[in-house]
């Protein structure tokens, strides 16, 4: 426990622009700073809020000692214009307790107050209780695992960046869609805190979890996450009680040996039914029946530049935003001289 507390009190610089409250409120007319029972929090309301409509809410949990108001991406017009969303950004001034963790059975005081604020917002605004989301960085990443394990069914989905969890909590994390991010060379929060709980979730049958590890990246993996172009769409595609179909199998997979002995794969983009669910989230590419890589679903080609000599067999699986997978594609063979 002491090791976890030591990790959580490290100062974390996050992937956002630092602004004063005055600057934020000037830039975003619907951003307010409020207090509730000693908890300071920022609340971003969608522009042109209409109580007759229903809106999602995203909860952001910051890292240790990072209590400054920040211009997070969820406020940006590029997201809000397509998906008007409430954003709640509470501030935790006690990094020794933080947002909680999965090594304890109770919420931290800051998380207790945050959940009370969420309940008050649900009562006051037209927020869809089936579309509550949470994400966090470092100390906030630990908080994501903590609140999802202690409040099963409250949140529709979440993502955790350079945080972590005990493996023992895996059984409580099986049913909430979760995307875990970590840098392989994290020098503040060891990658094992994310890697091992992911492996345990999968071992226990979890089907709605994804793990992305960035090779050679240290604690600042939030910079890589900021470049994940499907992240916001994936999160908002999740909703409690929502049912959707699986994507079609990848069609027309072809493999061509290039002059430099790399292998270029091309395919036709499959659709997902119903069409309203959107395009494929990502593809799994397999070489010789082993997972080679995962790539975004809007791509239709990939070059394998790391194959040894000999014959190699490739196939693919399409994964929808609901985690459902297609049947495997046909296999294609390539021989590298």
Segment roles from a protein language model:
Residues 57, 64-113:
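Active-site machinery of serine-nucleophile hydrolases
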Residues 48-53, 98-138:
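Gly/Ser-rich "nucleophile elbow"/oxyanion-hole loop immediately N-terminal to the catalytic nucleophile
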Residues 123-124, 130-172:
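Primarily recognizes the serine-hydrolase "nucleophile elbow" in alpha/beta-hydrolase
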Residues 20-57, 135-137, 142, 147, ...:
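A domain-start/cap signature at the N-terminus of enzymes
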Residues 304-324:
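Beta-strand-rich modules
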Residues 161, 177, 181, 187-248, ...:
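C-terminal catalytic histidine-bearing segment of alpha/beta-hydrolase fold enzymes
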Residues 54, 270-288:
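Solvent-exposed loop/turn segments flanking beta-strands in beta-repeat/beta-sandwich domains
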Residues 240-278, 321-337:
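Pro/Thr/Ser/Gly-rich low-complexity, intrinsically disordered linker/stalk tracts
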């Amino acid at each position: 426990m002491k090791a976890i507390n030591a990790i959580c009190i490290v100062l974390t610089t996050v992937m956002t622009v630092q602004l004063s409250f005055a600057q934020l409120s000037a830039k975003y007319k619907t951003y307010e700073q409020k207090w509730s029972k000693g908890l300071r929090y920022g609340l971003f309301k969608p522009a042109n809020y209409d109580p007759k409509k229903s809106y999602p809410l995203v909860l952001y949990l910051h890292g240790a000692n990072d209590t400054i108001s920040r211009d997070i991406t969820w406020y940006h017009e590029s997201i809000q214009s397509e998906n008007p969303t409430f954003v709640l950004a509470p501030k935790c001034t006690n990094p020794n307790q933080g947002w909680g963790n999965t090594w304890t059975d109770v919420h931290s005081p800051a998380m207790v107050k945050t959940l009370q604020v969420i309940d008050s917002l649900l009562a006051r605004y037209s927020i869809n209780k089936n579309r509550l989301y949470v994400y966090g960085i470092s100390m906030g990443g630990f908080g994501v695992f903590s609140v999802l394990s202690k409040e099963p069914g409250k949140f529709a989905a979440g993502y955790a960046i350079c945080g972590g969890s005990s493996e023992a909590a895996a059984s409580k994390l099986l049913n909430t869609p979760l995307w875990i991010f970590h840098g392989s060379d994290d020098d503040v929060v060891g990658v094992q805190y994310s890697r091992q709980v992911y492996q345990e979730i999968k071992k226990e049958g979890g089907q709605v979890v994804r793990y992305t590890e960035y090779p050679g990246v240290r604690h600042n993996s939030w910079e890589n996450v900021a470049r994940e172009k499907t992240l916001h769409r994936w999160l908002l595609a999740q909703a409690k009680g929502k049912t959707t179909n699986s994507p079609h199998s990848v069609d027309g997979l072809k493999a061509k040996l290039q002059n430099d002995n790399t292998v270029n794969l091309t395919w036709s983009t499959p659709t997902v039914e119903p069409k309203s669910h959107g395009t494929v989230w990502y593809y799994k590419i397999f070489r010789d029946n082993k997972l080679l890589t995962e790539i975004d679903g809007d791509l239709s080609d990939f070059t394998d530049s790391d194959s040894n000599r000999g014959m190699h067999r490739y196939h693919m699986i399409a994964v929808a935003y609901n985690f459902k997978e297609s049947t495997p594609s046909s296999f294609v063979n390539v021989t590298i001289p």
